[in-house]
């Protein structure tokens, strides 16, 4: 399958490919805009996504040194105000304690690197690098539920971001190559600020991720259109804009039902689209 000339594999497109080949084909190859609601109620969903986007923007501005008082005065919405308050409580740890003195902070930074005949790209909420070697990846999550570690460790973001940092992040490390053992990825949940999830990287994980990503991309290149089949997990379809096109239903999934179902992780549904929005918006 020929990909668009300007196409780069992001964590969102890779997750699409793993979750549902058909969604990857429609969104990433055909780039089909489909006029469907992602989640009900529409206004509540749109408000929640917008506040998530606003939070990422505010966090970036705070980390580059804009006055906190000015940023705080711009808040609109209860969710955003709560997330922002939690972030401000956490912020001293990013600027003084941990990472602390000597750390360099890179907010909303993009990295890209070739892999075979394709390119990988990642948009990082924050990379913190210390001259003595540690490099931390922070990713802000605004979902109401805290995702389980067992789910996060399977996410393509958890595999791509540390791998890509090792491949392309030497300029963040005074020009020296970053070794996998220097890297740690931290998911910080705005609704659960005292319960971050941390993943320490390793050379073994780096090699496994390179093999996995290479195989995944090579598989895509060999596929014909008929090979981009629908997912067997039709729970994902309720929150996919292409559900009616694929004859997987017309009515959007209910946001309250999703958030109340402890067996369903929010990262597999609505949060996925927000991550893709964020990758584009801050580029």
Tell me what each language-model feature is:
Residues 20, 55-56, 126, 185, ...:
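A residue-level signal for conserved active-site and pocket-lining positions in enzyme catalytic cores
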Residues 103-105, 109-215:
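Mg2+/Mn2+-dependent nuclease catalytic core
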Residues 35-44, 69-70, 147-150, 171, ...:
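Short, polar/flexible loop-turn hinges at active-site or ligand-entry regions and domain interfaces
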Residues 1-8, 14-15, 114, 118, ...:
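Anion-coordinating catalytic cores for phosphoryl-, nucleotidyl-, and glycosidic chemistry
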Residues 9, 165-283:
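Metal-dependent nuclease catalytic regions and adjoining charged, substrate-binding loops involved
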Residues 32, 61-65, 164-171:
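Active-site catalytic microenvironments for nucleophilic, acid-base chemistry
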Residues 1-61:
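Charged, glycine-rich intrinsically disordered N-terminal tails and low-complexity linkers that flank
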Residues 39-110, 114:
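A non-catalytic, helix-rich entry segment at domain boundaries
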């Amino acid at each position: 399958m020929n990909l668009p000339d300007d196409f780069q594999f992001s964590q969102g497109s890779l997750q699409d490919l793993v979750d549902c080949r058909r969604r990857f084909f429609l969104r990433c190859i055909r780039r089909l805009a489909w006029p469907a609601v992602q989640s009900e109620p529409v206004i509540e969903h749109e408000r929640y996504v917008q506040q998530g986007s606003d939070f990422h923007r505010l966090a970036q501005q705070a980390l580059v040194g804009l006055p906190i008082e000015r940023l705080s005065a711009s808040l609109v919405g209860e969710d955003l105000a709560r997330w922002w308050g939690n972030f401000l409580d956490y912020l001293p740890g990013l600027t003084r304690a941990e990472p602390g003195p000597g750390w360099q902070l890179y907010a909303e930074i993009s990295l890209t690197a070739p892999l075979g005949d394709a390119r990988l790209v990642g948009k990082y909420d924050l990379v913190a690098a210390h001259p003595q070697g540690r490099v931390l990846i922070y990713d802000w999550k605004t979902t109401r539920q805290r995702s389980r570690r067992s789910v996060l460790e399977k996410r393509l973001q958890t595999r791509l971001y540390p791998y890509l940092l090792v491949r392309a992040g030497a300029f963040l490390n005074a020009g020296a190559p970053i070794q996998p053992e220097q890297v740690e990825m931290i998911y910080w949940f705005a609704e659960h600020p005292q319960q971050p999830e941390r993943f320490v990287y390793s050379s073994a994980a780096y090699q496994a991720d390179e093999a996995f990503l290479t195989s995944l991309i090579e598989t895509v290149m060999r596929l014909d259109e008929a090979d981009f089949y629908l997912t067997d997990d039709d729970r994902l379809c309720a929150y996919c804009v292409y559900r009616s096109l694929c004859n997987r239903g017309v009515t959007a999934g209910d946001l309250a039902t999703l958030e109340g179902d402890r067996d369903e992780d929010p990262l597999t549904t609505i949060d996925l689209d927000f991550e893709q929005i964020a990758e584009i918006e801050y580029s």
